[in-house]
Amino acid sequence: MFDLTGKHVCYVADCGGIALETSKVLMTKNIAKLAILQSLENPQAIAQLQSIKPSTQIFFWTYDVTMAREEMKKYFDEVMVQMDYIDVLINGATLCDENNIDATINTNLTGMMNTVATVLPHMDRKMGGSGGLIVNVTSVIGLDPSPVFCAYSASKFGVIGFTRSLADPLYYSQNGVAVMAVCCGPTRVFVDRELKAFLEYG
């Protein structure tokens, strides 16, 4: 099992329950630093996380995962000043809006790919990094499509394809960065939304 003791973790998150609950677990793993990058600040959640492990340093940055690549590079240069290095990158930003296909694809797929492309050089052993782990959070709908969430499903299929490509042993042998996907099941909020959309469609 991957030992997180003393590690520096960067979590690109949305504002949902999965991100908060995952962060709570991370805070029990003796990590040294946790950077949380998401669109909205939540001081109460940060305080709750800090209470779990006061010795872990938590940093928060407001982050737009859809920003241009060049802007993203400058952004992470500032993040690295505080983090020094990144051992684990978690890409958890997600959006489900069938009425806004561009935003859904840009958040779930393009933004995630740009984030990986921006952070990977900081982790790459050939470029002075220490290697590590990238976790791309996707969905079971990326494995088995949903008839009422076509754009969301397509974006999550893309995440799995991108992740499987980067997870090839050839890459790991050169950069020391393992890549994996976590396919989350339905949450109550998502199920309620899917049922409502299905009934409206019917």
From Swiss-Prot:
One of its GO terms (cellular component) is cytoplasm. The keyword Oxidoreductase applies. NAD(+) binds at residues 11-34. One of its GO terms (molecular function) is oxidoreductase activity. The keyword ATP-binding does not apply. InterPro entries: ADH-rel, NAD(P)-bd_dom_sf, Sc_DH/Rdtase_CS, SDR_fam. Keywords: Oxidoreductase. The active site is at Y152. Signal peptide: none annotated. Pfam families: adh_short. Substrate binds at S139. Belongs to the short-chain dehydrogenases/reductases (SDR) family. This is Alcohol dehydrogenase-related 31 kDa protein. It comes from Drosophila erecta. The gene is Adhr.
